[in-house]
């Protein structure tokens, strides 16, 4: 297998080109309704409802599963969104664009006119768990939810709830038995005399990358 290869393009198409199988996939898809990348027809994240968004990602990860070894795993980072519907103004979820030239695009992703059934103004949608349960229904084994705790979260001006400072990382496996090296990720004990099992809350600072879509997620180089 070729290593250190970066492929550009739509993952829904590029995944079909793979000849070799991978043992692990680590990814963080575009979150629902939080950003406009300027490609209205093809981008993921501006669907008309959370359910449409989840269904699209289920299809993506179905292709991912086809490219995993039988003992392979999927590590999926996913953040949540709030429902924001104003009568007469529609549903405004997309607040910013990666590209300044796309921030004022007069497209459906900037303001949706439909009111979503089952959601109230200011509701936390619960997108990570909607996706997790949908992937489980599609055949994935949902093995664990990991909390990514952010010591330096994005400031929020909201005054009627706590500042959001965590996201989810889900561990999925293709089959019941899969590769997981528990010893490789053990952490030092408090006294420094031994090692202990890694726990399911990971404290990782976010780091800005001005040339990388202003986005970051925890990686194997951020193990703490």
Where is each model-derived feature located?
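Conserved SAM-binding strand-loop segment of SAM-dependent methyltransferases
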Residues: 4-10
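SAM-dependent methyltransferase catalytic-core segment centered on the flexible catalytic loop
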Residues: 11, 21-122
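Short loop/turn elements that flank and shape the SAM/SAH-binding pocket of Class I
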Residues: 12-16
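Feature marks short, surface-exposed loop/turn motifs that line or immediately flank catalytic pockets
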Residues: 31-35, 82-84, 149-152, 176, ...
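Short, solvent-exposed loop/turn and secondary-structure capping segments
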Residues: 35-38, 86-89, 147, 182-184, ...
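A SAM-dependent methyltransferase catalytic signature shared across enzymes that methylate proteins
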Residues: 131-144
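Flexible, glycine-/basic-rich loop-and-beta segments that form/coincide
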Residues: 143, 149-201
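Single conserved hydrophobic/aromatic residue that forms the stacking wall/gate
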Residues: 215-224
């Amino acid at each position: 297998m070729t290593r250190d290869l970066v492929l550009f393009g739509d993952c829904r198409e590029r995944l079909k080109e793979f000849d070799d199988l991978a043992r692990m996939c680590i990814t963080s898809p575009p979150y629902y309704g939080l950003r406009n990348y300027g490609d209205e027809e093809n981008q993921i994240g501006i669907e008309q409802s959370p359910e449409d968004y989840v269904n699209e990602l289920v299809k993506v990860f179905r292709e991912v599963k086809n490219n995993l070894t039988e003992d392979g795993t999927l590590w999926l980072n996913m953040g949540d969104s709030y429902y924001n519907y104003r009568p007469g103004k529609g549903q405004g979820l997309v607040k910013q664009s990666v590209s300044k030239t796309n921030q004022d695009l007069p497209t459906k992703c900037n303001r949706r006119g439909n009111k979503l059934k089952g959601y109230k103004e200011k509701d936390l949608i619960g997108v990570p768990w909607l996706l997790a349960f949908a992937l489980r229904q599609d055949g994935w084994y949902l093995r664990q939810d990991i909390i990514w705790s952010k010591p330096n979260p994005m400031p929020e001006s909201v005054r009627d709830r706590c500042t959001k400072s965590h996201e989810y990382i889900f561990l999925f496996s293709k089959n019941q038995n899969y590769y997981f090296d528990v010893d490789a990720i053990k952490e030092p004990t408090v006294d420094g005399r031994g090692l202990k099992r890694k726990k399911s809350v990971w404290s990782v600072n976010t780091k800005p990358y001005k040339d990388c879509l202003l986005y970051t997620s925890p990686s194997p180089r951020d193990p703490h």
